């Protein structure tokens, strides 16, 4: 019987990290280092706000872009910590996690045949997101001698006339590599020259706010 699913879905390999996660979840006294999540319960003040919202009946649809107050606070936080100003009405979209943001972002930017540059090792969802968006993932193999940081030379060598997006995790997942300001400035010049989108997977903002930011 022919598989009824789309070929691009069938061809996506399951996440190895998730396989280990499922195995460890059935074991007692095992510490999982598989998925990136805190090793403590959600703080009570956050849980209290969630409970309060439920009790106040805030359980209905919001704007497609997310709660107004949340989008405004996101802009305020980015402006305060990084000195960059965004318009909360037109430039901020709240998603259910970073993977959804990358998924819908690539779908919005890519046409069939466009290329998405993905430095690896990297988070397992980047490549499937590019494929599901109809794009072609192009892998840039990062080197240990460069501390797994993307270099300007590696980026330039990977760019073609079909290149549309560069995915740039900060810090790198799973290696933990952090791009220095000089690295980013060199890459920014190449990005500007070739007019390429950059999708920054900026997951751990609070943990690295003392360094030079993107």
Q: What name fits each language-model region?
A:
Residues 58-189, 206:
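Conserved core of the PLP fold type I
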Residues 193-196:
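A short helix->loop->beta-strand "cap" motif at the edges of active sites that frequently abuts
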Residues 23, 189-190:
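Alpha-helical scaffold elements within enzyme catalytic domains, especially in hydrolases
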Residues 212-214:
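N-terminal low-complexity segments that are often proline-rich with Ser/Thr-Pro
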Residues 8-97, 104:
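N-terminal small-domain helix-loop-helix segment of the aminotransferase-like
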Residues 1-8:
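Generic N-terminal amphipathic, Lys/Arg-enriched alpha-helix
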Residues 203-210:
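Conserved small/polar residues in nucleotide/adenosyl-binding loops
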């Amino acid at each position: 019987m022919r598989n009824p699913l789309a070929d691009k879905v069938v061809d996506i390999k399951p996440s190895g990290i998730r396989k280990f996660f499922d195995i460890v979840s059935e074991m007692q006294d095992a510490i999982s280092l598989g998925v990136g999540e805190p090793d403590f319960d959600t703080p009570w003040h956050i849980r209290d706000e969630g409970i309060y919202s439920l009790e106040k009946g805030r359980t209905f649809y919001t704007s497609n872009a997310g709660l107004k107050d949340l989008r405004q606070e996101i802009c305020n936080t980015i402006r305060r910590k990084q000195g960059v100003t965004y318009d909360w009405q037109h430039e901020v979209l709240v998603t259910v996690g970073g993977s959804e943001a990358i998924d819908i972002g690539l779908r919005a930017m890519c046409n069939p045949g466009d290329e998405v540059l993905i430095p690896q090792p990297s988070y397992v969802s980047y490549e499937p997101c590019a494929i599901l968006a109809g794009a072609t993932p192009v892998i840039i193999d990062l080197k240990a001698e460069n501390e797994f940081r993307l270099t300007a030379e590696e980026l330039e060598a990977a760019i073609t006339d079909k290149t549309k997006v560069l995915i740039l995790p900060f810090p790198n997942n799973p290696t933990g590599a952090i791009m220095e300001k000089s690295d980013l400035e060199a890459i920014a010049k190449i990005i500007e020259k070739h007019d390429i989108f950059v999708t920054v997977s900026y997951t751990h903002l609070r943990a690295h706010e003392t360094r030079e930011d993107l």
